[in-house]
Amino acid sequence: MLQPKRTKFRKVQTGRNRGLAKGTDVSFGEFGLKAVGRGRLTARQIEAARRAMTRHVKRQGKIWIRVFPDKPITEKPLEVRQGKGKGNVEYWVAQIQPGKVMYEMGGVPEELAREAFRLAARKLPFKTTFVTKQVM
C-alpha cells in the first residue's frame, strides 16, 4: 500500500475537500483517467485500480499513477466510548478534486487503454472520464 515514509504530524484534522484540482492535463502518457467528481481515494482503491489496468493490458506499455495518499484517516475501535483522545491512524487517502488526472497510460492502442481505464473506474468511488493528450 502507498503511504508516506515520514510525516511532520501523525494525525491531521478532517478539513474540507473544496476547490479545483492541479494536474489537469495528461503529462507523461498518451491517455489519462480524469476525475469528474470529488472525493477521497484510499491507498487500497489506488492499488486495486492499478492492478485492474495492469492485468488488462498484460503488462505492455507504461502506467503512471499521478495521485499519492498523503492524508491519514483516524478511527476509534468498535464499542469504545467517545472522548479519551483521537483514534489511531487506520488508512491513508488522497483528496481528489474535479479535473484531476489520476492515472496515465502510454505505449498501448487507444481501444485497449479505454477498456483498461473503464475497468479501473469501476474500482473508484466517483465518476471519471477518459482523456487523451492535447497536441498543440
Curated annotation (Swiss-Prot):
Entry keyword set: Ribonucleoprotein, Ribosomal protein, RNA-binding, rRNA-binding, tRNA-binding
Protein's recorded name: Large ribosomal subunit protein uL16
Function: Binds 23S rRNA and is also seen to make contacts with the A and possibly P site tRNAs.
Species per Swiss-Prot/TrEMBL record: Vibrio campbellii (strain ATCC BAA-1116)
Gene Ontology biological process: translation
Subunit structure: Part of the 50S ribosomal subunit.
Stored SUPFAM superfamilies: Ribosomal protein L16p/L10e
UniProt-listed Pfam families: Ribosomal_L16
Ribosomal protein as UniProt keyword: yes
